[in-house]
Amino acid sequence: MQLLTLPPSPTLATSIRATAQVFEDPRSQALLAHLQQVAPSEASVLIIGETGTGKELVARHIHNLSGRRNGPFVAVNCGAFSESLVEAELFGHEKGAFTGALAAKAGWFEEANGGTLFLDEIGDLPLPIQVKLLRVLQEREVVRLGSRKSIPINVRVLAATNVQLEKAINAGHFREDLYYRLNVVTLQLHPLRDRPGDILPLARHFIRSYSDRLGYGPVELSAKAQAKLVEYSWPGNIRELENVIHHSLLTCGDGTVQAQDLRLSNLRIERQEEEPAGNGVEDLLQRAFSRLYEEQSGDLYEKVENALLRSAYRFCHYNQVHTAQLLGLSRNITRTRLIAIGELVVNKRRGQEQQVLDNRVVRLSI
């Protein structure tokens, strides 16, 4: 049985979602064959899969099968840093580059030099950082924050996402050119519910692992427990399976895990399907407008305009650039309208001339 596990030291795994991966199911075996074909190359790889499907484990396996196996493997969760810190974390910074930068520090690209950099949750990167990442991938060099000196790097980039980047591109949240740069090779990791042949081998691995930790003797799965595991949909994938097995070992009493020992969640995650063809969105808007018309409010246009802007601003996590792109407006117009509706506070140090200029900007038109 082909089994992948994370390194023993948790400090070596900075983006833990699943701690083990097997390739017993036919779908997993096909993935493994594809993985073994592309791993020796230097091509960028985009790994797509739900949370808990083992994306980091697959990335590590690619690294171990490549010519960079003796170099560093650095895993970075792009969603773990604020927008103000992610640039310094990825590309490094010089002393005094920002408040608190008391010394120069290499970024993750420099740390991974000669090896592999795994960027998990790549879809969470802010657009300005996506531009800089694209340049790094094209030029093979980084410029630290607060510096003008470029530093050559030799890094293979593997990226992963649990969202559909094509939809993010259409929504203006992800750059199309960066997508094609990262997506030289695509590896699709199927959720656990779609590869039932992996469930019992994984369960037995976790039983052995936790039995050793707990000081237990051999533990078996009853036939009914096995059937229950295979029939469950596993919305949390491998990570959920590991937690269920851990709990079952704490409650089973005779060296056999029974069906009643398996505490399965009642959580049902609604997965977004493709919208059917038609005018569903337009119909919803028409119904909403009809209700507003019935109220016969004299300032309806302004209410709708302000509500649209506020909603878009919050949807974009209060990012002006993303909001402007989503609405198809310039940043100046967006900023001026956000100030007008009280979503932004004007900097008191701005001069009178800038205030006059802002007031001349054309109002948002829906």
UniProtKB/Swiss-Prot annotation:
SUPFAM superfamilies: Homeodomain-like, P-loop containing nucleoside triphosphate hydrolases. Disruption phenotype: Cells lacking this gene are still able to convert dimethyl sulfide (DMS) to dimethyl sulfone (DMSO2) under sulfate limitation, suggesting that the conversion of dimethyl sulfone (DMSO2) to methanesulfonate (MSA) is interrupted in this mutant. The keyword Nucleotide-binding applies. Induction: Under sulfate limitation conditions, it is transcriptionally activated by the LysR-type transcriptional regulator, CysB. It comes from the Bacteria. ATP binds at residues 49-56, 112-121. GO terms for molecular function: ATP binding; ATP hydrolysis activity; DNA binding. Residues 21-250 form the Sigma-54 factor interaction domain. Involved in the dimethyl sulfide degradation pathway. Activates the expression of sfnG and sfnF. PANTHER family: TRANSCRIPTIONAL REGULATORY PROTEIN, TRANSCRIPTIONAL REGULATORY PROTEIN FLGR. This is Sigma54-dependent transcriptional activator SfnR.
